[in-house]
Amino acid sequence: MQNMVILGATGSIGASTLSVISANPLAYSVYGLVANASVDKMLALCVAHKPKVAHMVDEAAAKQLRAVLPATLNIQVTTGMNDLLGLVTAAEVDTVMAAIVGAAGLVPTLEAVKAGKRVLLANKEALVMSGELFIEATKRSGAVLLPVDSEHNAIFQCLPQEVQANLGRCDLAASGISHILLTGSGGPFLRSDLATLAAMTPAQACKHPNWSMGPKISVDSATMMNKGLEFIEARWLFNTQAEQLKVVIHPQSVIHSMVQYRDGSVIAQMGNPDMRTPIAHCMAYPQRIHSGVEPLDFFKVGQLSFYEPDFERFPCLALAMDACAQGQEATTVLNAANEIAVEAFLQGQIGFTQIAKVNEACLVTVPKRPMGSIEDILALDAQTRVYARETLASIA
């Protein structure tokens, strides 16, 4: 029986994880649930899954949850960073699902790694912001790191065992690998007239053609910043050089990524676009369990298509690839700027195409600094957010 803590329990990844746990009740137990401020959702999850601990990041939300949670459930409600770090490092915890969106998930995820936990990584920002530190911490602690993002999970499944066992430290060329092909659907605006993009609304941007996701990642998919962040994540997870990584537009989202070998072989991982599949794979690895996802019906799929990315349509993708080439400072700046810009777009403060402008302005202007510690990373993140908000004020 694996005891699991779910960071981001009330989000879409959290819901999918709990669905897989419910389908395999003899193998997994919910030890802790972590959410920001969604009291009603957390209450429902506590009643359904009966964790030992329910942690609310928002202190007022924790008080509300304590007031409404039935005492008979005997669930401890906690709040504050110290309690959160205590939860993810607790001796009783075997596995941590790291699914808090954005920079907020970095510190607890890194602490789980340092504690040597089995970490299922759905928070791509952890590697985007702290790639080298994160990989080094994994190496020192002996933590097991498994990628949940559908693309990175697909790549992982297509790799030989010696690479799977050495994430972040592997040598792709020595294993006969020539390229990693990172696929992306192109989002809801793949075929939209370029002249119409500036007027696209948050509701339109969040209407992904294939995947069911939260608002932030949905907007990132529409700008293809999500693919850019995944490009950076892949660089750290698989220890790649820039020339070993390629982005391929694949509108059907059936092939989740591919690995090309020296002998001309290409191995692809395929399946219906449902996050329960990669989640179940990570939870059970190296075994396989029931995920609740219907198997792929090739006769219904009909055809698969592939295109090169259009950087005029997707400037955020180009910015992310450039930042990856520049290094850790640039990717930290880009991530922070993008979080501020996307939130402003979702709140109607800026237009869709202005997201890329905010990101570019921060990349050009925010002074870079040495990144030797988590404190350095968080300081640069905070500095970038201040500048991004100033940039918003100037263009709003």
From Swiss-Prot:
InterPro entries: DXP_reductoisomerase (IPR003821), DXP_reductoisomerase_C (IPR013644), DXP_reductoisomerase_N (IPR013512), DXPR_C (IPR026877), DXPR_C_sf (IPR036169), NAD(P)-bd_dom_sf (IPR036291). One of its GO terms (biological process) is isopentenyl diphosphate biosynthetic process, methylerythritol 4-phosphate pathway involved in terpenoid biosynthetic process. SUPFAM superfamilies: 1-deoxy-D-xylulose-5-phosphate reductoisomerase, C-terminal domain, Glyceraldehyde-3-phosphate dehydrogenase-like, C-terminal domain, NAD(P)-binding Rossmann-fold domains. The keyword Translocase does not apply. GO terms for molecular function: 1-deoxy-D-xylulose-5-phosphate reductoisomerase activity; manganese ion binding; NADPH binding. Its cofactor is Mg(2+); Mn(2+). The keyword Protein transport does not apply. Gene3D superfamilies: 1.10.1740.10, NAD(P)-binding Rossmann-like Domain. Pathway: Isoprenoid biosynthesis; isopentenyl diphosphate biosynthesis via DXP pathway; isopentenyl diphosphate from 1-deoxy-D-xylulose 5-phosphate: step 1/6. Its EC number is 1.1.1.267. Keywords: Isoprene biosynthesis, Manganese, Metal-binding, NADP, Oxidoreductase. Mn(2+) binds at residues 149, 151, 230. It comes from the Bacteria. Pfam families: DXP_redisom_C (PF08436), DXP_reductoisom (PF02670), DXPR_C (PF13288). It catalyses: 2-C-methyl-D-erythritol 4-phosphate + NADP(+) = 1-deoxy-D-xylulose 5-phosphate + NADPH + H(+). Coiled coil: none annotated. Signal peptide: none annotated. NADPH binds at residues 10-13, 123, 125, 214. 1-deoxy-D-xylulose 5-phosphate binds at residues 124, 150-151, 185, 208, 221, 226-227, 230. Belongs to the DXR family. Catalyzes the NADPH-dependent rearrangement and reduction of 1-deoxy-D-xylulose-5-phosphate (DXP) to 2-C-methyl-D-erythritol 4-phosphate (MEP). This is 1-deoxy-D-xylulose 5-phosphate reductoisomerase. It comes from Shewanella baltica (strain OS223). The gene is dxr.
